[in-house]
Amino acid sequence: MKAQPILAGCARGPVLRLDHPLSFWGGVDPASGALLAPPQCSIAGTVLMLPAAIGSSSSSAVLLELLRNGQAPAALILGQIDAILGLGILAAGEMGWKAIPLLVLDAAEQARIETGTWVEIDAGGGILQMRQGAHIQA
């Protein structure tokens, strides 16, 4: 499976796929990485898949805080390009913090990967499904 890399990078981790858009501002605790609405689990270390991000430009600041605090996802895969989240990732890299890959993969392709599936992402946007059954921590 191949995604479009917006900000290239390599990552691996369990997929957390949400079927609804997410606002990082008010939707994610920047200190812990916890989602504030169901499924109320942590996004830290996951390959977070979303159909879209919603919200204001403050979402880039929340993602920047997640990266600074070590509570960010390992990679972010969206159904459409989102410049606001990309800005947060770019700012983290400029500040010397770990930046994460940002990719675009359409909803039909996202639906082929279940939450808990371990994936590996290469720098070209290739997504290799490694195994099923990872437990996402609540």
Predicted features along the sequence, with ranges:
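Feature captures the catalytic cores and cofactor-binding loops of soluble hydro-lyases/lyases
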Residues: A3-L7, A11-I127
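Phosphate/diphosphate-binding glycine-rich loops and adjacent basic-rich segments that engage nucleotide
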Residues: G124-A138
